[in-house]
């Protein structure tokens, strides 16, 4: 989730937890029952989509998931609400194990945030060993 720290800081953790539950529910409604949705921790979610063969279909689903973050709480949330950035890694092309796919999805996530947040990016081999300075500075400053 983009800018979620501001929600907890300004509206409190109880409100933030309610937003997380709502967003999780909305994500689940955007995917099939055979897909897997989980919260990795903090403000990060993971979605495993099975048997989607077209990049267009994956892009459409990523857009639907981003739309799920247009929360019913948007008016209460400062600075225009929350949004999400999505990093996408494909099995088996980007990796054959969970760790490889997570690492590459994370690299794609950083690329999506670099594009301006509230969007998605597919992993690309050019991301390997690439530094993402603004994201790294956010992490270092605790944002």
Task: Describe these PLM feature segments.
Residues 47, 82-84:
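HATPase_c (GHKL) ATP-binding subdomain of two-component histidine kinases
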Residues 29, 72-76, 112:
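Histidine kinase transmitter module recognition
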Residues 35-36, 73:
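Glycine-rich ATP-lid/hinge loop adjacent to the conserved G-boxes
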Residues 1, 42, 117, 125:
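ATP/adenylate-binding site constellation spanning eukaryotic-like Ser/Thr protein kinases
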Residues 2-32, 38-42, 46-47, 53-63, ...:
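Conserved long alpha-helical elements within nucleotide-processing catalytic cores of c-di-GMP signaling
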């Amino acid at each position: 989730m983009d800018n979620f720290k501001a929600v907890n800081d300004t509206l409190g953790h109880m409100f933030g937890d309610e937003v997380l539950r709502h967003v999780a529910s909305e994500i689940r409604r955007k995917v099939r029952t055979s897909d897997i949705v989980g919260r990795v921790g903090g403000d990060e979610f993971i979605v495993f989509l099975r048997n989607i063969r077209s990049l267009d279909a994956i892009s459409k689903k990523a857009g639907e998931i981003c739309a799920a973050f247009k929360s019913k709480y948007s008016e209460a949330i400062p600075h225009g609400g929350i949004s999400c950035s999505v990093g996408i890694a494909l099995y088996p092309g980007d990796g054959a194990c969970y760790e490889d796919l997570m690492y590459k999805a994370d690299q794609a996530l950083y690329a999506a945030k670099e594009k301006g947040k509230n969007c998605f990016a597919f992993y690309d081999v050019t991301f390997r060993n690439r530094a993402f300075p603004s994201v790294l500075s956010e992490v270092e400053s605790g944002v």
